[in-house]
């Protein structure tokens, strides 16, 4: 454990278009090599595609997708007397959001559409409808936690 003081979390300002902190976090996760304007273009372009295709508010669709992807439980490795157990633990709220966003971005990159905007829009719409690889990842994570429920007493 570090002995220094705990570093304060940085304040995240709402994004200019939707006035929402979650969108800012998402743009920051999407950003590569500090190119924020490109990440914003991809994100807002994907939101425009969602609005065009689904005929509904892209922000609501995004939040619904994120809620469908956020994991409640995950497993952590714990070494006990030479054996390593996968111990199910509850996920903190801020980590839930971070994992959900990360999974949406990761699995949208692996999709077959041509541009990143189309890939991202497709994955967000699939996740909002409880389909897609990001939702499957959450289900797999929950299955792992359920399968290892016997080791829950090793929690720390």
UniProtKB/Swiss-Prot annotation:
Q: Which GO terms describe its molecular function?
A: rRNA binding; structural constituent of ribosome; tRNA binding
**One of this protein's GO BP terms?**
translation
Q: Give the highest taxon in the source lineage.
A: Bacteria
Which family does the record assign? Belongs to the universal ribosomal protein uS7 family.
| Protein name as it appears in the record | Small ribosomal subunit protein uS7
Describe the function of this protein: One of the primary rRNA binding proteins, it binds directly to 16S rRNA where it nucleates assembly of the head domain of the 30S subunit. Is located at the subunit interface close to the decoding center, probably blocks exit of the E-site tRNA.
Q: Spell out the PROSITE patterns in the cross-references.
A: RIBOSOMAL_S7 (PS00052)
Please give the organism.
Myxococcus xanthus (strain DK1622)
Pfam families on file: Ribosomal_S7
Sorted alphabetically, which keywords does the UniProt record give? Ribonucleoprotein, Ribosomal protein, RNA-binding, rRNA-binding, tRNA-binding
């Amino acid at each position: 454990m570090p002995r220094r003081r705990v570093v304060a979390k940085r304040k995240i300002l709402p994004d200019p278009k939707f006035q929402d902190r979650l969108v800012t976090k998402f743009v920051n996760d999407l950003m590569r090599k500090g190119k924020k304007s490109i990440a914003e273009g991809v994100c807002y372009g994907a939101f425009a595609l969602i609005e065009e295709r689904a005929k509904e508010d892209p922000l609501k669709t995004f939040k619904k997708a994120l809620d469908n992807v956020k994991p409640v439980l995950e497993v952590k490795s714990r070494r006990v007397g030479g054996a390593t157990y996968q111990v199910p633990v509850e996920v903190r709220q801020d980590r839930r959001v971070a994992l959900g966003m990360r999974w949406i971005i990761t699995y949208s990159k692996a999709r077959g559409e041509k541009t990143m905007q189309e890939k991202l829009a497709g994955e967000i719409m699939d996740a909002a409808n409880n389909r897609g690889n990001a939702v499957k990842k959450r289900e797999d994570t929950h299955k792992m936690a359920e399968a290892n429920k016997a080791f829950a007493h090793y929690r720390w």
